[in-house]
Amino acid sequence: MSSHALGLRGPADPALLERLAALRTELELPSAFPTPVLAEEEAAAHGVHVGLAGSPDHADRTALPFVTVDPAGSTDLDQALLLTPSDDDGILVRYAIADVPAFVAPGGAVDAEARRRGQTVYLPDGRVPLHPEVLSEDAASLLPDRERPAFVWTFLLDAAGAVVETGLERARVRSRAQLTYGQVQAFLDAQPGAQAPTTPRPGVTDADRAAAEGWPAEVRDSLALLPEVGRRRAAQEAARGGASLNLPDQEVRVTEDGAHELVHRAPLPAEEHNAQLSLLTGMAAAELMLAAGVGILRTMPAPDTDAVAAFRERTRALGVPWDEGQDYGAYLRSLDPADARHLAVLHAATGLFRGAGYTAFDAQAEDPALRTPPDEPAQAALAAPYAHATAPLRRLVDRFVLALCHAHAIGAPAPAWVRSALPALPALMADSSRRASAASRTAADLVEAAALESRVGAELEGIAVREAKDGTEVWLLDPAVSLRVPGSVPAGTRVRVRIEGVDRASGAITAAGVDWSHSSR
């Protein structure tokens, strides 16, 4: 499952930027890194790079033509990929993940600060990073044409996409190119037999279409296999009853007259194919740790019957019913985020699976509560055990998972510094996730309020989603946002609402029903 990003394009007005800045203070998000942290990381980065070429701990894999694929403008590059054909219609997947443990001394200043932060927090006007930029955007980032230490996963997939073999080693790698999703999608659309759209694809520019002309053949051959890997892994997901929820990115664009316009950008197929590589790696990491009896999983319980019933009712209200007997994953895959009703369902689906967290276990721990792996190790939405293992530059727990998995893969004991941290990691990640979620929710309220400020007094169309004690939840069709409107209207009713006021400081939006027969106003 992936969450949507919230972006800001254009010169936002000072009031919005000031409010977003204040949000950091209100949520007590960390600001600048302390001097000892920066000094320690500078020294660590220098030491790692000086010693990397002769490091006995890192195999030389610099001849492999890895590339990174990320959103445009990214500098914290965690992952690089290489795909090659194998015998019997198989595909060999190599996935390099930044070796952050090489740069962070256990118990040091950087480690302590990372535990305090937990994860990178993304806001419309920037981010609050987990690590100092000298690490996350330079020394450990898999930037092109630079040797970097990495954990290199190797997966041999059969013709159906099942994993036949798994390998993991620490290695030196050198990415050949830093590519964007738009560039890769343009390249894939131009391949023989590709089902390219007849109209320009949103998120792909003319510059993206021209970029592939300079790629070497080995890079082109690798990326040409990405859709097939994505399709095979998606088929495996469907077969086990799993589902990935890929929400559109929400973006606020500033128009020439200074108004804020809210738009949604659905993930490109290349993004969804690439996401399957991270899911593949996370499931392999979980299997390794469960087999070894030491690890930390990303767990999520199955939804209860009341939650499922409420979600089904909401889908019916929106005119996109999830029928009894229809597989949940197949239902999600049938939705088109470009349709406002379908988009509302996708957002509602985020509330179906609740209770996600981290579960640590260690068969040799002194604490009896840690000695037994979880009774239900699966991440319910994925229908498989899963671990976070592919974003160590941006998420604390991945650093520990990667170190554990490497030890398990080579038959070495689990590192003592990891085992000692396992009891505390679930709470550290839960705390940082609460801060990140609060920041995301509040920032979304602020930018949605900014987008609706120019619509005060306007009447907008929407759909009544559900009735509540304090009014009716309405999903506006354009812009696609959710509002609470005083009054009562049956779920599923097409309605009109008037935007009566916007509080830019709080992000609150006041609206009233227009000609609602049951309205209280």
Specify the residue positions occupied by each region the protein language model found.
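Electropositive polyanion-binding surfaces
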Residues: 2-24, 36-495, 500-509, 518-521
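Alpha-helical structural modules in large enzymes and assemblies
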Residues: 31
